[in-house]
Regions:
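Domain-scale selection of a single, long terminal region
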Residues: 16-17
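Helix N-cap and loop-to-helix transition residues
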Residues: 12-13, 125
């Protein structure tokens, strides 16, 4: 994919990324202004002002001029779907995939590298990255991720890079991927604000979680969260933007009585403690319970998949965005959640955490093999 050697002279608008890059992607209503004539500049939304960046796209289009606008992926093959020199900002990613394997969303791995780093800042199965954490398509909409009809995957997180950006996909499955379509929109700019941070996304799973048993004397207390499920853990400074979570139930009854606990800057006690899993995802009362659960998908929170709720084999796909109040850290961050009250359940969890931070960052856990990533009921 060819690109200009130098971007056209431009000046990065201070508000373009700001301190919270994700807020730019979601859009924030303009605040009320004093009732004075003024120049009108403060009343104008950003999109009505002159734009100084260079708009570009890299895609899977047919270089011959034909209509074969896709890439096949053989088993074990890695395809570079994006490579650009900076400074720049990826503003939108769109994929759609045609593959015979029922779990190709779990088998294809997405990785992103910033500024020549050999370690990926994003490493996750492609479906999980787009909020399809159980490996099956489900149409939904949110501020930063969506799945459009019928199998279109979209991401609107802003991803700044100073020197370079590189994105790959790897087919770790046993079958050919017949067609991988890609469109990645980005902008070249003359410079980025000093406070611009790098986008990260980390996959984790517990298949299953280990249930903690208590004697009657313990009264099922969990003040320190030591056995909690861990969404992400990192060193450095930055802020958490949110998580997606898939749950496969291995037992009857409500699976979401666990509280979130967030540990900031090496604190041994959680700085943030919630009141239940459905509360963290901004729902309530067991999402409607065994016979009343109704899927929902809003800008900043959702449970876009709920099937066989509160039963063995029950399936949930959930998301929560913290763009209204990103969880900041200066030294470290560990985001966790109980699996059932005081970790008394052994359901399967599959999650991705999304955040921005400075470099360097802590190493990611080793990505589990495909067989372990595929959702399977595991009865105790």
């Amino acid at each position: 994919m060819s690109e200009p050697e130098t971007a056209r002279p431009s000046k990065v608008r201070r508000r373009f990324l700001g301190g919270l890059v994700g807020l730019w992607a979601a859009g924030v209503p303009a605040k009320a202004q004093p009732q004075s004539a003024g120049t009108g500049e403060a009343r104008l939304p950003e999109y009505a002002c002159a734009q100084n960046h260079q708009s570009l796209k890299q895609s899977s289009y047919d270089r011959t001029g034909g209509n074969a606008d896709r890439w096949p992926l053989a088993p074990g093959e890695t395809k570079e779907v994006f490579n650009a020199n900076g400074p720049g900002i990826i503003s939108h990613i769109w994929f759609t995939i045609a593959a015979p394997s029922s779990y190709h969303l779990k088998e294809i791995v997405l990785r992103m590298y910033w500024d020549g780093n050999s370690k990926p800042s994003v490493e996750t199965p492609v479906g999980d990255f787009f909020g399809l954490n159980l490996g099956q398509y489900n149409v939904y909409q949110s501020a930063f991720l969506n799945c459009s009809s019928i199998k279109a995957l979209n991401c609107y997180f802003a991803m700044p890079f100073r020197k370079s950006a590189r994105i790959t996909v790897t087919n770790e499955g046993a079958q050919n991927v017949g067609a991988f379509y890609s469109n990645i929109d980005y902008q070249l700019v003359s410079s980025l604000p000093e406070r611009s941070l790098y986008f990260h996304a980390q996959y984790r799973q517990a298949t299953p979680n280990r249930a903690v048993t208590f004697s009657s004397a313990d009264k099922e207390l969990n003040p320190d969260g030591k056995e909690n499920y861990v969404y992400m853990e990192t060193k450095g400074s930055g802020h958490l933007m949110g998580v997606t979570l898939g749950v496969l139930q291995n037992a009857e009854r409500w699976m979401g009585e666990g509280d979130e606990m967030v540990f900031v800057d090496d604190d041994s006690k959680p700085v943030i403690t919630g009141t239940g899993s459905e509360d963290y995802f901004c729902g309530a009362w067991d999402f409607g319970g065994r016979d009343g659960a109704i899927p929902f998908a809003h800008l900043y929170n959702g449970a876009h998949l709920m099937a066989s709720a509160e039963r063995i084999g029950g399936r949930y796909c959930l998301y929560r965005w913290h763009s209204d109040n990103p969880i900041t850290f200066r030294k470290s961050l560990k985001h966790t959640m109980e699996h059932g009250h005081a970790n008394n359940r052994a359901d399967c969890f599959y999650s991705v955490a999304y955040w921005y931070q400075s470099e360097p960052y802590a190493d990611f856990p080793t990505l589990p093999p495909v067989a372990e990533r595929t959702p399977i009921i595991k009865l105790s």
